Curated annotation (Swiss-Prot):
NCBIfam families: greA, PRK00226.1-2, PRK00226.1-4, PRK00226.1-5. The gene is greA. HAMAP family: GreA_GreB. This is Transcription elongation factor GreA. GO terms for molecular function: DNA binding; RNA polymerase binding. It comes from the Bacteria.
Length: 157
C-alpha cells in the first residue's frame, strides 16, 4: 500500500469528517430509510429511494476516508527544518514578471486549497520547488506560458 504524505491538521480534518459521517450522517440516513419504509410501497416511494441513494453516497465517503487514513503518512511539519523546500514547507515566492508575492504551504493532495494558500505536493509549482533553496528561481509551465518564481523564504510553521 502506497503511503500518502499528510500534515497533522489534514489527518485531523479527515478523522473529524469520518467521525461525523459515522455518528451523525449514517444514523440519520438509516432513520430516514426506516421512516420511508413505514410509508408502504417502496417501488414508488421517492423518499425511500432518495434516502437509499444518500446512504450509498455516505458509505462511499466513509470508505474513501478510511482508505486515505490507512495510507496516511502523517508528518508534523513543526518538527521539520532545513533550507530546502520539501513537503510541509511554507514557501514565499515572487513572480518574476509581475513582482507579485505569494506564500504557499506544500501539503497532501486532499488538503490542497489554493485560496487558503495550500498547494498539493503534486502540483506543478510544488514539483518545481522541491529541493530548491532561498534565492533559486524555478520555472513552471502554465497554460499562459512559462512562469518564473524566485524563492524568497522557506518556513516550517
Amino acid at each position: 500500500m502506497e503511503k500518502v504524505p499528510m500534515t497533522v491538521a489534514g489527518y485531523q480534518t479527515l478523522d473529524e469528517e469520518l467521525k461525523r459521517l459515522k455518528t451523525v450522517e449514517r444514523p440519520a440516513v438509516i432513520a430516514a430509510i426506516a421512516e420511508a419504509r413505514s410509508h408502504g410501497d417502496l417501488s414508488e416511494n421517492a423518499e425511500y429511494h432518495a434516502a437509499k441513494e444518500r446512504q450509498g453516497w455516505i458509505e462511499g465517503q466513509i470508505a474513501e476516508i478510511e482508505d486515505k487514513i490507512a495510507r496516511a503518512q502523517v508528518i508534523d511539519v513543526t518538527k521539520l527544518s532545513g533550507k530546502q523546500v520539501k513537503f510541509g514547507a511554507t514557501v514565499s515566492v515572487v513572480d518574476e514578471d509581475t513582482e507579485e508575492e505569494a506564500r504557499y504551504q506544500i501539503v497532501g493532495d486532499h488538503e490542497a486549497d489554493v485560496k487558503s494558500g495550500r498547494i498539493s505536493l503534486s502540483s506543478p509549482l510544488s514539483r518545481a520547488m522541491i529541493g530548491k533553496e532561498v534565492g533559486e528561481v524555478v520555472e513552471v509551465n502554465t497554460p499562459g506560458g512559462v512562469k518564473a518564481y524566485e524563492i524568497l523564504k522557506v518556513e516550517w510553521l
